[in-house]
Amino acid sequence: MRVEQLSIDIVGLAGACSYALDCIEAEFVNVKNKHGKRVAYISVCMAKYCAIQGDALQDLAICALLHDNALTQYISEEVQKYPDTDIKNDLSENKTNMHCVYGEKNITKIPFKTDISNVILYHHEHADGTGPFRKKWHEIPLFSRIIHLADIVDIIGNSIESADHRWDFICQYLSQNKDRLFDSECVNAFQKGLTKESFMCLRDDSFETKLWEIVPREKQFFDWETCKNVADFFAKIVDYKSSFTSRHSIGVAEKASLLAHYMGYDSVSVQKMYLAGALHDIGKMAVGNEILEKPDKLTDDEFSKMKNHVGYTYLILSEVNDFEDIRDWAAFHHEKLNGKGYPFGKTADELNEQERMMACVDIYQALTEDRPYKKGLSHEKTCDILDDMSQKGFIDSDISKTIRECFGRI
């Protein structure tokens, strides 16, 4: 029997994730919001003067959007090894090779249509061989060189307060650093691919419309293994945000799909539940670690900010075409049947079975997993808590009973 495949707007999903990554960069590296999308826009504008089109153009856009995909992993591991490290200075001194290594490994989870080997690995290399891996321009993939130039241009451009002076300053900067930081081909592609007018649209949100006009957003059909790889890629980014929830998203994804299969859902719905579980906490990327990892009870203001994460999940995933089901299953996991949940205060008649399932699975996973400040509860104790919550009108009693049966087999 042929297994149905899930259709996904992978470029849109990469764009949505880039927003979450930008939140991390803004927190730790002082990069302005929508950095990933601006890098993608500059990159694809340069691409037409480098004979890049079709599938290759789409792959370049995805690489640009996700060029710093391992930043949360790098920061997490650095802080664990060196608790007193100054992350901002560590990154600004070009100690970037590890996040490039991690990012290159991570990106292999994404199903590209062309060869993007070493693109993320070498996206901080200099044309003259003075970058982290000492590669010269002819040893560096073209995509890497384009993304490197676009990355630097965006960071420097946003550091100049006077918007009217940015274009002239950038053009002068590129000319001064041609054949040193940047190769001639990429500098020429920037000068031909962008005008002052097209560059200045980066000041507002109009560049996003232009980005999606240039880049094809054709949906791709994924089999179960590919869907799982894509979901795990994004879950890993989310879970590295905080050491308190190191495997939470993947755990929710695994159990949500297991429960869906147990309840008789078709293969596409099971895949969608896995993806929704992997993405359910992507909004936490917009919440500071001082709140996520606070050892004491949160203040009312801090708890309000914490609750915003599901609203951010809804907002972030709304960027993906034809993703409404997965978005809602992911974003409504803190809603309650009695209408006292968040972010929207939905009531029982507004929450479908999949949304109720995700709420129960999230609670189950949170209670059973070990965290730095607590030991995970047993299956039986957790199910007793779920039953109590269902009796109080918070969650679905039938799903709570099914979880006791289904997860009791694990």
Describe the residue ranges of each PLM region:
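Histidine- and acidic-residue-rich, metal-dependent catalytic cores
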Residues: 2-410
